[in-house]
Design a protein with these regions (language model features):
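Active-site-facing substrate-recognition patch
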Residues: 1-51
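PRPP-dependent phosphoribosyltransferase catalytic core
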Residues: 2-4, 136-184
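Short glycine-rich phosphate-binding loop at a beta-alpha junction
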Residues: 51-58
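Conserved acidic residues
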Residues: 52, 120, 150
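Gly/Ser/Thr-rich loops at beta-strand to alpha-helix junctions
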Residues: 58-64, 131
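Short Gly/Thr/Asp-enriched flexible loops that form oxyanion-binding sites at enzyme active sites
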Residues: 64-72, 139
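A short helix->loop->beta-strand "cap" motif at the edges of active sites that frequently abuts
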Residues: 73-75, 146-147
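Short, glycine/charge-rich flexible loops or terminal/linker lids adjacent to PRPP-binding catalytic cores
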Residues: 75-122
Length: 184
């Protein structure tokens, strides 16, 4: 089963995958799709507030944030990592429970990136905002670093996220019943 969606002037067929016996989600994957990544970045930047740094979580939205930084001529962007690495130094840490990840996971912000964020305007970017848990975790890292969240953006807002007034997005994405029909 697939769901056709138009986003940033392009149409893509998104495959559906079950999350539970009664819930399926459409997989929106920009990895390997430079045309979609470039178009979404361009359209998001048209809506973006002024920012000092962009922030996302590993891994699916890295191409999007990279392209946004390139188009905005930003010299640096930040990525919260899913695993602690020695080169992250005295990293900041938070926990996230995402709809697409079984169980909880941690996100880490490097010591160097945390120092960059202090007192700066941080624009949080994700490929899809759904439950808002990943967004909440990124906001927590920004607060820990002493940064200021100036905006929250995504290519798609899934399910009830499309009703939020504190995010900017390009297109809504429904959740689906097990039979592939959009939930209402």
């Amino acid at each position: 089963m697939h769901y056709p969606i138009e986003v940033a002037g392009l149409t893509r067929d998104l495959p559906l995958f079950p999350v539970t016996d009664t819930l399926s989600i459409a997989a929106f994957i920009m990895l390997g799709d430079p045309e979609l990544t470039e178009s979404c970045a361009r359209e998001l930047l048209k809506k973006a507030p002024a920012f000092d740094y962009l922030l996302t979580a590993e891994a699916k939205s890295i191409p999007l944030i990279h392209e946004m930084a390139r188009q905005a001529k930003a010299h640096r962007y930040c990525v919260a990592r899913k695993r602690m690495k020695v080169y992250l130094g005295n990293a900041l840490r938070t926990t996230v429970h995402s709809i697409t990840t079984k169980g909880g996971q941690e996100l880490f912000l490097s010591e160097d990136e945390a120092k960059l964020m202090k007192g700066k305007r941080i624009l949080i970017v994700d490929d899809v905002i759904s439950t808002g848990e990943s967004l909440r975790a990124l906001e927590d890292l920004v607060r820990q670093a002493g940064g200021i969240v100036c905006g929250r953006m995504s290519a798609l807002a899934e399910g009830d996220a499309a009703k939020r007034t504190d995010i900017q997005y390009l297109a809504p994405l429904p959740l689906f019943n097990a039979d592939g029909m959009p939930k209402v």
